[in-house]
Every structure is written in structure tokens, then in C-alpha cells.
């Protein structure tokens, strides 16, 4: 799937796409009787949020895309270290999985590195749901969904793009490009933020989003 997407060739079938996951959100909103919502997502979640806004604009009060990209592979510009860490295969045992999580520090916020917290989060993730094939399916969904260039250029919803200046997995350029494509988008670049949202930055991120959504 990845090779076909990068070469812009016909794609083999995939279990689901970003559109399917965006449709899941619509289903949840219907169940909750919500006609509109502020749609926020980070990383792959930002891609799903973009697709939601594109395909369901009347249900979108605003779009908040965090450390994400517009479906243009050339904007990702991952460092070799970050990509190596992302593609590394974790051990299947709990202890090995937890220690392996430290490799992801390659693309996380260096200033706020916290190995103990990384281990605790990995332990929680393993205990909640260790399902490696899910990661493969998620990657397939991303690449199978293609470019959103023209669709984002035609988007007419209030949009906030947030991106870390130190992100080495999805480059700051990807955030800048996303904001450039969407008419009227607001771009906020965050100092010392990698491809994660460490606790010391929570206040700044929440305040930024709150100020934006309260105006909409």
C-alpha cells in the first residue's frame, strides 16, 4: 500500500481508510445528538480531522489539526532517526515493549524527555491493547487515503493548525503547508515541541485552542 501510494499507482484493498474513521465520528455525534462539533486531532488524528471537515463540513464547527500533514508525502520530511524509530518493531513481551518505547524519544520533545513517564505510558498501552497488526492497518489507512491538497484548498471552515518547531517525524513544513492550503487558517508553531504533547505544554496548547474555538 505504501509503495503504491508513494508511486501514485492503483492501491490494493485496505481494511479501512481515514474516511471510514471520520464516518465513525459522525455516527458518535448522531448518537449524542450533536449537530456540530469542534473537530480536533493530532498526528494521524489530525488527518482524520481534516477528512472529517472535508467530507462533513456542515457538522464541523471548526477544525484543529495538530502536528499533522495534508496527505502530501513530500511534506513529511522525517529525519532518518525518527523514521527508524517509527518503523522499528517492538518486542512482543511486556518488559521488552516498555523498554522499546524509549526509542520513540527520537522524535519526541527533547526538552521534556521523561523516561519514567514513557515507560509508564507504554505499560498502560500494552495492558490496554497489545495489537501490533493495528499499527499496520493504521499506516495503510493513511497512505490509502491519498492527497488532500485540492480538498483542503476548497475547505470553508474555521481552522487552527498547531505544530511543534522540533518535530522530526512530521516536519514543521507539513504544518506550515497545511495552514497554507486551507483558506484563512491560523498557524501556531510551538517552541520546544516535538511529535508529542508533553505535559509542560498542555496549558499553552489548551489556551490556544480555547481562545480559537470561543471566537467561532
Regions found by a protein language model. Give the residues of each.
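Catalytic active-site module of serine/aspartate enzymes centered on a nucleophile-bearing elbow/loop
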Residues: 185-216
Amino acid at each position: 500500500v505504501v509503495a503504491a501510494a508513494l508511486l501514485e499507482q492503483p492501491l490494493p484493498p485496505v481494511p479501512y481508510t481515514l474516511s471510514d474513521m471520520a464516518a465513525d465520528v459522525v455516527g458518535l455525534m448522531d448518537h449524542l445528538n450533536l449537530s456540530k462539533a469542534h473537530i480536533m486531532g493530532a498526528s494521524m488524528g489530525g488527518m482524520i480531522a481534516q477528512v472529517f471537515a472535508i467530507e462533513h463540513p456542515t457538522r464541523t464547527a471548526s477544525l484543529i489539526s495538530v502536528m499533522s500533514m495534508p496527505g502530501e508525502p513530500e511534506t513529511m520530511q522525517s529525519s532518518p532517526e525518527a523514521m527508524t524509530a517509527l518503523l522499528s518493531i517492538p518486542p512482543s513481551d511486556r518488559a521488552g515493549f516498555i523498554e522499546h518505547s524509549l526509542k520513540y524519544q527520537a522524535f519526541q520533545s527533547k526538552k521534556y524527555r521523561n523516561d519514567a513517564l514513557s515507560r509508564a505510558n507504554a505499560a498502560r498501552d500494552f495492558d490496554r491493547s497489545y495489537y501490533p497488526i493495528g499499527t499496520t492497518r493504521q499506516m495503510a489507512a493513511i497512505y490509502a487515503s491519498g492527497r488532500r491538497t485540492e480538498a483542503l484548498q476548497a475547505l470553508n471552515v474555521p481552522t487552527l493548525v498547531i505544530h511543534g518547531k522540533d518535530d522530526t517525524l512530521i516536519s514543521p513544513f507539513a504544518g506550515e503547508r497545511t495552514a497554507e492550503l486551507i483558506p484563512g487558517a491560523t498557524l501556531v508553531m510551538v517552541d520546544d515541541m516535538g511529535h508529542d504533547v508533553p505535559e509542560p505544554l498542555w496549558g499553552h496548547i489548551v489556551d490556544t485552542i480555547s481562545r480559537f474555538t470561543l471566537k467561532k
